């Protein structure tokens, strides 16, 4: 594999995983809030 591919894909993967992590955390928080409001 060419090192240039890693230079381009590496930061994209880091950014994508960071976005998924943040969105996932917010979604879980909202879900818990919604469930606690229901009961």
Swiss-Prot record:
The keyword RNA-binding does not apply. InterPro entries: PSII_PsbY. The chain crosses the membrane at residues 5-23. One of its GO terms (biological process) is photosynthesis. GO terms for molecular function: manganese ion binding. The keyword rRNA-binding does not apply. Loosely associated component of the core of photosystem II (PSII), it is not always seen in crystals. PSII is a light-driven water plastoquinone oxidoreductase, using light energy to abstract electrons from H(2)O, generating a proton gradient subsequently used for ATP formation. PSII is composed of 1 copy each of membrane proteins PsbA, PsbB, PsbC, PsbD, PsbE, PsbF, PsbH, PsbI, PsbJ, PsbK, PsbL, PsbM, PsbT, PsbX, PsbY, PsbZ, Psb30/Ycf12, peripheral proteins PsbO, CyanoQ (PsbQ), PsbU, PsbV and a large number of cofactors. It forms dimeric complexes. This is Photosystem II reaction center protein Y. It comes from Rippkaea orientalis (strain PCC 8801 / RF-1) (Cyanothece sp. (strain PCC 8801)). The lineage of its organism: Bacteria, Bacillati, Cyanobacteriota, Cyanophyceae, Oscillatoriophycideae. The gene is psbY.
């Amino acid at each position: 594999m060419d090192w240039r591919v890693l230079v381009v894909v590496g930061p994209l993967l880091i950014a994508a995983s960071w976005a998924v992590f943040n969105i996932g955390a917010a979604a879980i928080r909202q879900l818990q809030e919604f469930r606690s409001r229901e009961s």
